[in-house]
Design a protein with these regions (language model features):
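A generic, well-ordered mixed alpha/beta core segment in the N-terminal half of proteins
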Residues: 95-184, 192-193
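Active-site cofactor/substrate anionic-group-binding motifs, chiefly glycine-
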Residues: 62-116
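Residues forming anionic-ligand binding surfaces in small-molecule and nucleic-acid pockets
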Residues: 88-98, 109-125, 225-247
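Phosphate/diphosphate-binding glycine-rich loops and adjacent basic-rich segments that engage nucleotide
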Residues: 162-236
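Acidic, glycine/proline-rich low-complexity segments that act as flexible tails and inter-domain linkers
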Residues: 2-23, 28-47, 52-53, 60-81, ...
Length: 391
C-alpha cells in the first residue's frame, strides 16, 4: 500500500496541472528509486533529503523533477554512483576535494561537514570541490552550517546557461550562491541563482507548456525569447543563447551585476579548485566537471555568538516591521517563506506537476519499479508529450 496521508490518489488541482502527495509517499518513492540507481540505503536517504527539502521549500525546479536527469547522467556515465570524494589538498582552514564524478549531493555533504569541522576548530573552514555533479539547492549546505550555529555559504558552477552582458553565447552557469545564519524566530536563509532564473525553472515552464516571461531568456542569435523548448534545446546543443544574468541583458538594468556575481561564484568553485569552468562543464563524454565552494564561519571568532545572534535577530525584526508600500501588508526576510512553505506542505502535501509524474512513471518502467505501488489510483495523462508508454 502507498504511504500517503493525503489520500490514495492525492489532491488534484486541475487548473494548475498538479497533484499533491504526502511527504511520506514521496520520501518512500525517492528512496526506492535511488537504491535502484545503485546507491546504498544511507546514500539514498541523503540524496532524497536534499531533493525533498527543495520541494518542501517550494523550490520545485530542484526537487523530484531532477530525478530523471540524474538517471540519465548515470546511464551516460557522467555520474559514477560508486565514486568517493578524496581530499587532494588541505590546510587547517581549507581543503580541496576531488569528487571523482560522484553524486553531487553526497560529495557536497561531505565537503560542508569538513568545512564545519574546520570552522569549529579554527573559526573558519573553506572547502572547494572539483569533478562533481549537480548538487541540488545550494541552500541545503549553507543550512547545514547554520544548524550547527555557524554562518554557512555554498555555491556551485554548472553547465553554461548564462549569457554574459552584451553576449549571445552562454558562458557561465546559473551559479547560485546561498548564505544561512542562525537567528530568531527562524534563521536567515538566502539562496538564489545569479541568472534571472535557473534552467530548472525553464524545465518547469516547458512541462507546464507555458511561454517564458519576458526578460528571462535569449535565443541563439541573442534576441529575447519566450520559447522554453527552443531555449532549452539550444542550451543542450550548445547552439547559443541561454538565460540572462540577474538584471537582464542591459547595463542600465544591472545586467553587469548579475554577471559579476556569477563570476564570484566561479572564483569560489572552479578557479580555487583548479576545476572545470562553466563554459566547459557538461562537454565531456564521461563527466560533467561541475565544481562547488563551501564556507563555514564561527560567530565566536568575532565575539559572543549569542549576542551576535540577538543583534542579527533584532535587525531582521526591524526589517519586517519597517513601513510597507501601499497595498502591501508584509515585508519578508530571507528564509521566512521557506519556513511557511515547509509547514504548509508537510501538512497538506507537496505538489508534483502531471508531466513530472509522467516522467517518474517512465522512470519506474525503466527501473522495473511498480509506479502504482507508490501512487495508487493516479491516472497518467496519456496525451502528455513526456509520455513514452514505458511504465
Amino acid at each position: 500500500m502507498p504511504i500517503n496521508k493525503i489520500g490514495t490518489t492525492g489532491k488534484r488541482d486541475e487548473t494548475m496541472g498538479y497533484v499533491k502527495w504526502s511527504y511520506e509517499t514521496l520520501n518512500h518513492f525517492c528512496g526506492d528509486v535511488f537504491k535502484a540507481f545503485g546507491f546504498t540505503e544511507e546514500e539514498s536517504n541523503q540524496i532524497k533529503d536534499v531533493l525533498l527539502t527543495a520541494d518542501l521549500y517550494g523550490i520545485e525546479s530542484h526537487g523530484m523533477q531532477r530525478m530523471v536527469r540524474y538517471h540519465k547522467g548515470i546511464e551516460k556515465g557522467t555520474i559514477h554512483p560508486q565514486a568517493k570524494p578524496e581530499v587532494v589538498f588541505e590546510t587547517p582552514i581549507s581543503a580541496v576535494i576531488d569528487g571523482h564524478n560522484g553524486m553531487g549531493q553526497l560529495i557536497s555533504v561531505y565537503a560542508m561537514k569538513k568545512a564545519i569541522e574546520k570552522a569549529k576548530k579554527t573559526g573558519v573552514g573553506i572547502v572547494t570541490v572539483c569533478e562533481s555533479n549537480h548538487f541540488g539547492i545550494a541552500g541545503y549546505y549553507a543550512k547545514m552550517a547554520c544548524d550547527e550555529g555557524l554562518l554557512g555559504m555554498a555555491c556551485t558552477n554548472s553547465e553554461a546557461i548564462m549569457v554574459p552582458t552584451f553576449g549571445k553565447k552562454a558562458m557561465l552557469g546559473s551559479n547560485p550562491i546561498a548564505v544561512a545564519m542562525p537567528a530568531d524566530p527562524y534563521p536567515f536563509f538566502f539562496d538564489c541563482s545569479t541568472t534571472v532564473v535557473t534552467r530548472g525553472k525553464l524545465e518547469m515552464y516547458n512541462k507546464m507548456e507555458k511561454p517564458l516571461p519576458d526578460g528571462w531568456a535569449l535565443d541563439k542569435d541573442g534576441h529575447a525569447s519566450t520559447d522554453a523548448p527552443d531555449v532549452l534545446a539550444n542550451i543542450v546543443a550548445k547552439k547559443g543563447g541561454g538565460i540572462m544574468p540577474l538584471g537582464g541583458n542591459e547595463e542600465v538594468t544591472g545586467s553587469h551585476k548579475g554577471y559579476g556575481y556569477g563570476m564570484l561564484c566561479e572564483l569560489f568553485s572552479s578557479i580555487l579548485s583548479m576545476g572545470v569552468t562553466s563554459d566547459h562543464c557538461c562537454t565531456f563524454p564521461d563527466k560533467t566537471g561541475i565544481c562547488h565552494g563551501f564556507m563555514a564561519i564561527d560567530p565566536a571568532a568575532f565575539g559572543d555568538p549569542q549576542a551576535i545572534r540577538r543583534h542579527f535577530s533584532e535587525y531582521l525584526e526591524a526589517l519586517r516591521e519597517s513601513p510597507k508600500a501601499e497595498g502591501k501588508d508584509r515585508i519578508y526576510t530571507h528564509g521566512e517563506k521557506e519556513v511557511f512553505a515547509e509547514k504548509e506542505r508537510r501538512e497538506h502535501g507537496i505538489p508534483v506537476n502531471d508531466n513530472t509524474m509522467v516522467e517518474l512513471a517512465n522512470l519506474c518502467g525503466y527501473l522495473k519499479l511498480d509506479f502504482g505501488k507508490y501512487f495508487e489510483g493516479y491516472e497518467l495523462p496519456k496525451d502528455s508529450k513526456f509520455f513514452t508508454g514505458n511504465y
